Amino acid sequence: MSKRALISVTDKTGVVEFAKELNKLDYEIISTGNTFKTLKENGVNVMQVEDVTNFPEILDGRVKTLNPYIHGGILYKRDKESHVETVNEHKIHSIDLVAVNLYDFEGTLKAGKSHDEIIENIDIGGPSMIRSAAKNYKDVIVVVDIKDYDSIIEKLKTDTMTLEDRKKLSYKAFSTTGRYDALISSYFAGEVGDTYPDILNLTFQKEQTLRYGENPHQNGFLYSQSNAKNPILNYEQLGGKELSFNNLNDLHGCLEVMREFKDSEEVVSVAIKHANSCGVGLGKDAFEAYTKCYEADKVSIFGGIVGITSTIDKATAEKLNEIFLEIVVAYDFEPEALEILKQKKNLRILKLAKIENSLQPYEMKYLDGKLLIQDRNNILAEKSENVTKEKPTDAQLKDMEFGMRVVKNMKSNAIAIVKNGQTLALGCGQTSRIWALKNALENNKDKDFTGAVLASDAFFPFDDCVTLAHEYGISAVVQPGGSIKDKDSIEACDKYDMVMVFTGIRHFKH
């Protein structure tokens, strides 16, 4: 009995050549719809599914291959006598290779098609054939990836197709149908408004193999979530080396801070080191913003990454090139500025799509077999309540907002001391709030903190932070409030003629 291959593909790249090679290997080809038409027109010896099933396609093509003459031919075990007797009794011909790729559900979704069009692009027969062939991988070769055509033909020609090869193809097949179903499930979750379903189907596809992970002894990879809404890591690389694991992590931190200021009339420049801000500056243009960012911490910025929410001009590029940086990311680059930055061969230059609010409603943290999920931290403050005798000036209120936008993106416990749209001192990742403040102040003793604003990601449990801030000349504090000892901090502010404003929103970040 001759071997048979069933071919039914949406992506017809390379399928004619593949089918012709199968013909040369004495495979009979069965096909459906447009695939049959393509193969026939290109000289492939092919028969229609109806020739096998003796039943026409019905329901506008919804039912083509859902038939015992198809699935029986795929699923029967060649080494089981009762199976062989059954297919012989019913005159079911074996199908030994199944090459299927599915209706482009994902592409239809991304194209913003109507609900009815999306539904019609849910493949039923394709996944069924793939799963049948993958289940019976010992007897049937399943092909879901056009990149596998050449290697499969070569193995068939040389009779070197091993059981391990078949198992790998089966694994790829089930991964493909699993991803496909997850995309459909995710679409329907959105349709019914179920943001946090009892069963969460997420699917990711490997985008990049990285040189290594966080450290050289760790492997590292980048996976992209299928159908992610407005991913923040959306950039075009214009120069420099390939991004590393740590580069990508730091870049994400940089873009999160840039997103905080996406609606600002001023330009923001942020410097990031180990995913934390080491300097942030606001300015009328890229040069002023970066200058303030750089002068905020001239030491820590070395070897960091810099993001700027505007187009980088020649003057800014020249200043950026004065120090070693891993990445420069901006909305765009003037031609002359780009050439200047490219003088540093290893500098990664990234052009960023304009940042929008994330449409992904939640953020995730993987905990070794479990997944923590929470709403995105999209709220800066729920109020601006002055709780002291002294009232904030307009300039102080502006710096308070600036400081809170910075500190909410730093690792807790976090403190940001700012003045005139520039960070003067930052303290983060400390196990006590007073240590975060001491760390910020003592590492920047050369700075003039007179009239500065202190922003805290969480409330003060004691009045020690206010007292220390006063000793350095800080005149205003913005914090969430909510401590049982708020009264102590308020009284300390009144004692020192300082301003304190409560926002009502805590910004822990771990």
Curated annotation (Swiss-Prot):
GO biological process, one term: 'de novo' IMP biosynthetic process
Keyword terms: Hydrolase, Multifunctional enzyme, Purine biosynthesis, Transferase
Pfam families, per database record: AICARFT_IMPCHas (PF01808), MGS (PF02142)
SUPFAM superfamilies cross-referenced by the UniProt entry: Cytidine deaminase-like, Methylglyoxal synthase-like
The enzyme's E.C. designation: 2.1.2.3, 3.5.4.10
Annotated signal sequence range: none
Molecular function, one GO term: IMP cyclohydrolase activity
GO cellular component: cytosol
Superkingdom of origin: Bacteria
Ranges for domain MGS-like: 1-144
Substrates-to-products reaction catalysed: (6R)-10-formyltetrahydrofolate + 5-amino-1-(5-phospho-beta-D-ribosyl)imidazole-4-carboxamide = 5-formamido-1-(5-phospho-D-ribosyl)imidazole-4-carboxamide + (6S)-5,6,7,8-tetrahydrofolate; IMP + H2O = 5-formamido-1-(5-phospho-D-ribosyl)imidazole-4-carboxamide
InterPro entries, sorted: AICAR_Tfase_dup_dom_sf, Cytidine_deaminase-like, MGS-like_dom, MGS-like_dom_sf, PurH-like
Pathway: Purine metabolism; IMP biosynthesis via de novo pathway; 5-formamido-1-(5-phospho-D-ribosyl)imidazole-4-carboxamide from 5-amino-1-(5-phospho-D-ribosyl)imidazole-4-carboxamide (10-formyl THF route): step 1/1; Purine metabolism; IMP biosynthesis via de novo pathway; IMP from 5-formamido-1-(5-phospho-D-ribosyl)imidazole-4-carboxamide: step 1/1
NCBIfam families: PRK00881.1 (NF002049), purH (TIGR00355)
HAMAP family linked: PurH (MF_00139)
Family: Belongs to the PurH family.
Entry remark concerning the domains of this protein: The IMP cyclohydrolase activity resides in the N-terminal region.
Protein name: Bifunctional purine biosynthesis protein PurH
